[in-house]
């Protein structure tokens, strides 16, 4: 069946705990560059993803990133993208509606093939969030990752790393003011940069990957537990796990339901601790699907996420 899901669209994913079960949101672009939202609550089916679920518009094939937290006004969501002028932009869910955020008015220029990642910590019903958005300013080999910071207003942050052009970026906060950023260095290895409240330093993680992989990262707990994901090629999604030390990366498989992904797919991940992890990807046939980890059951292919169908179908 035809889909309105843009071929090789970037993907962003978030989740949070709620009374009715884990809430998930996934963001992607349609054929016209509109950013759509699909929703899932608990074990209920996925909904949304249609032309009625547009939250904003970005340049075609814009990178996407998202963060969420609970505030006194309800669930807050921020979705980051790049507009047609390659300016870093933001769409805000303020607990009741989607609006355009402040970041776009700052005029942060982004490299034309830059990817994005974002993280937050500290956001609660009684405290504002600290948000970080990561991007590249230029397209050349050896260019750095740059950081833009929200702590009551938007300001430029640090820059670090020496990367391949258009590197994938994964970002996660493992605790208040403790940040982990993953990117592909000029030797094609996936590297880690760390911030522990006072300075940036190169972390201990390193993994070989083919050039141009998509990267996603999640974390939970006080240990902390970290998971880094990257797509190596057709049907080759890899995971590296940290729970005090890094394991040997392994391929995620479900022998009973092989589902080929596009060789140049982009991925996004969210989790509810180690109980339920989802990694979203674009499958052959241009459907939005997920690998799902359920504690005690392992990895399996989850439900297809709705992305809309053209009128007349």
Swiss-Prot record:
Cleaved signal peptide residues: none
Domain of life: Eukaryota
Amino-acid positions noted as binding beta-L-fucose 1 in the UniProt annotation, renumbered to this chain: 25, 37, 98
Annotated binding of beta-L-fucose 4, by residue: 227, 239, 299
Result after altering residue 225 to Q: Leads to increased binding to fucosylated glycans
Positions contributing to beta-L-fucose 3 binding: 132, 147, 200
UniProt keyword terms in alphabetical order: Fruiting body, Lectin, Repeat
InterPro entries found in the cross-reference section: Fungal_lectin (IPR012475)
Biotechnology (record note): AAL's binding activity could be used to identify secreted fucosylated glycoproteins that may represent candidate biomarkers for cancer since fucosylation of N-linked glycans has been associated with several types of cancer such as liver cancer. Identified as one of the several suitable fluorescently labeled lectins that can be used in a combination for the visualization and quantification of extracellular glycoconjugates in dental supragingival biofilms grown for 48 hours in situ in the absence of dietary carbohydrates.
Sequence repeat ranges, renumbered to this chain: 5-57, 58-109, 110-162, 163-208, 209-260, 261-304
Keyword hit for Transmembrane: no
List of residues binding beta-L-fucose 2: 78, 90, 102, 154
Record-listed alpha-L-fucose 2 binding positions: 180, 192, 204, 246
Annotated binding of alpha-L-fucose 1, by residue: 78, 90, 102, 154
Entry annotated with the keyword Transmembrane: no
One Pfam entry name: Fungal_lectin
Family: Belongs to the fungal fucose-specific lectin family.
Assembly and interaction partners: Forms homodimers. The two AAL monomers are associated via interactions between N-terminal and C-terminal peptides. Tyr-7 interacts via aromatic ring stacking with its counterpart on the other monomer, whereas Ser-284 interacts via hydrogen bonding with Asp-264 on the other monomer.
Protein's recorded name: Fucose-specific lectin
């Amino acid at each position: 069946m035809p889909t309105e899901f843009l071929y090789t669209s970037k993907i962003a994913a978030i989740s949070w705990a709620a009374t009715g079960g884990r809430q998930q949101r996934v963001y992607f672009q349609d054929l016209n560059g509109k950013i759509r939202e699909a929703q899932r609550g608990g074990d209920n089916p996925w909904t949304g993803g249609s032309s009625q679920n547009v939250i904003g518009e970005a340049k075609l094939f814009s990178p996407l990133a998202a963060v969420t937290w609970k505030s006194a006004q309800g669930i807050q969501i921020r979705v980051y993208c790049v507009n047609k002028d390659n300016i870093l932009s933001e769409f805000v869910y303020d607990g009741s509606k989607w609006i355009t955020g402040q970041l776009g008015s700052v005029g942060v220029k982004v490299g034309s093939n830059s990817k994005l990642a974002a993280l937050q910590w500290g956001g609660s019903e009684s405290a504002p969030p600290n948000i970080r958005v990561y991007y590249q300013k230029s397209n050349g080999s050896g260019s750095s990752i740059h950081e833009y910071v929200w702590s009551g207003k938007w300001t430029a942050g640090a820059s670090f790393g020496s990367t391949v052009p258009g590197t994938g970026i994964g970002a996660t906060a493992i605790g208040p003011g403790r940040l982990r950023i993953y990117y592909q260095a000029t030797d094609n290895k996936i590297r880690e940069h760390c911030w522990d409240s006072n300075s940036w330093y190169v972390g201990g993680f390193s993994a070989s990957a083919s050039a141009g992989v998509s990267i996603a990262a999640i974390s939970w707990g006080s240990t902390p537990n970290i998971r880094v994901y990257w797509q190596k090629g057709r049907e080759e999604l890899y995971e590296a796990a940290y729970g005090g030390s890094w394991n040997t990366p392994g391929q995620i498989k479900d022998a009973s339901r092989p589902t080929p992904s596009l060789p140049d797919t982009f991925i996004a991940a969210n989790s509810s601790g180690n109980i339920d992890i989802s990694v979203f990807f674009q499958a052959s046939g241009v459907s939005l699907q997920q690998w799902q980890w359920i504690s005690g059951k392992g990895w399996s292919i989850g439900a297809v996420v709705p992305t809309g169908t053209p009128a007349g179908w």
